[in-house]
């Protein structure tokens, strides 16, 4: 029950205009008043947290350092924000064919990796979530919640993250 209270408190803060300090320096009028992309950025910042040298190869808000990238610890919040937005934009482009659902899919992929959704053509098949969307079925809440495992075990905090992403980014009216 305490975890549910924390989640409700977090959502209350976001809806009422309070956001974690590190997540945004601007004054918010509630997360629902923000454009969906900005909501996604705040959700990712909140759940990824700040990655330091001990989290290598991740830096900032969960950017995975790629071969050839000249990134050194520590980085500024501005650099981390820029990396997050660049990564999220690339993921949105990857899921562009899913139109209104591309941002939600990009958020899941930011956390799990795009291969978990798209499949890798070898061992990992295309996800049931994408197969449903391909069939025109947008009843995907349960499928979104399945992306909550780490090393095969369900993780409650990741499940809460999926719940928040779905409720703040999914538009059922489309």
Question: Language-model segments: which ranges?
Answer:
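Early exported N-terminus immediately downstream of N-terminal targeting peptides
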Residues: 55-59, 63
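Short N-proximal segments of mature Sec-exported proteins
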Residues: 102-116
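Long, amphipathic alpha-helical surface segments
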Residues: 21-51, 63-67, 75-94, 115-174
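Surface-exposed patches in mature extracellular/periplasmic domains of secreted proteins
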Residues: 52-56, 95-104, 143
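Sec-dependent N-terminal signal peptides
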Residues: 7-16
């Amino acid at each position: 029950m305490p975890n549910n209270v924390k989640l409700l408190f977090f959502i209350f803060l976001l809806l009422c205009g309070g956001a974690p300090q590190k997540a945004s320096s601007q004054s918010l009028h509630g997360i629902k008043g923000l454009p969906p992309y900005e909501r996604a950025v705040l959700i990712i910042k909140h759940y990824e947290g700040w990655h330091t040298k001990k989290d290598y190869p991740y830096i900032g808000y969960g950017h995975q350092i790629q071969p050839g990238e000249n990134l050194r610890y520590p980085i500024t919040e501005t650099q981390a924000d820029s990396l997050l937005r660049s990564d999220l934009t690339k993921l949105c482009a990857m899921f562009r064919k899913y139109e209104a659902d591309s941002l939600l899919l990009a958020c899941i992929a930011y956390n799990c990796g795009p291969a978990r959704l798209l499949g890798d053509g070898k061992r990992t098949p295309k996800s049931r979530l994408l197969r449903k969307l391909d069939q025109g079925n947008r009843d995907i809440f349960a499928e979104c919640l399945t992306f909550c495992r780490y090393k095969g075990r369900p993780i409650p905090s990741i499940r809460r993250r999926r719940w928040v992403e779905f409720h703040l980014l999914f538009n059922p009216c489309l």
